[in-house]
């Protein structure tokens, strides 16, 4: 991962919500550490649930896009990204990662980091062929927009490589 991500600029984390979960706990922990080090931190969510309010540093900005229709989230996120310029943008978990390519289109200098927590081929193995084909295509196309892709295990990394994710962007 680029050294600048750990030391410079504002950071925005994208999550569906901040309900209790592993990815959300990682977001809360990293956000608190970045805020304590003096960085400007924003967490943007699609839905309102926030079970981490009591543990988040008061300097962290929370923004809820209040999505009523998931199909409209593309436009809500585009508008948010356009209005707020971040130095670093971190998207956790497919399908949020595929929406985040917008960052590179709107603000090309923003460092885009994807974090994948699951073996997607296993998580969605019971979905129909069309879903799995579209998922594979979306990963092969949109994961190339990321500056860096963090996989939480070797199994997750191998799965993403099987989908066509560039190995040189991964850790």
Residue spans for each PLM region:
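Membrane-interface segments of envelope glycosyltransferases acting on lipid-linked substrates or membrane lipids
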Residues: 1-171
């Amino acid at each position: 991962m680029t050294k600048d991500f750990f030391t410079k600029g504002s950071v925005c984390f994208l999550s569906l919500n901040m309900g209790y979960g592993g990815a959300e706990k990682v977001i809360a922990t990293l956000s608190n550490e970045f805020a304590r080090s003096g960085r400007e931190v924003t967490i943007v969510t699609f839905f309102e649930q926030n079970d981490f309010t009591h543990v988040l540093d008061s300097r962290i900005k929370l923004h809820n896009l209040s999505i009523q229709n998931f199909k409209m989230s593309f436009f809500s996120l585009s508008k948010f990204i356009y209005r707020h310029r971040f130095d670093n943008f971190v998207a956790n978990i497919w399908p949020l990662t595929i929406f985040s390519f917008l960052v590179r289109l709107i603000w090309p200098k923003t460092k885009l980091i994807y974090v994948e927590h699951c073996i997607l081929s296993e998580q969605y193995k019971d979905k129909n062929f069309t879903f799995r084909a579209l998922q594979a295509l979306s990963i092969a196309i949109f994961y190339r927009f990321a500056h860096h892709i963090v996989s939480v295990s070797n199994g997750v990394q191998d799965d993403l490589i099987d989908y066509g994710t560039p190995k040189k962007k991964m850790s």
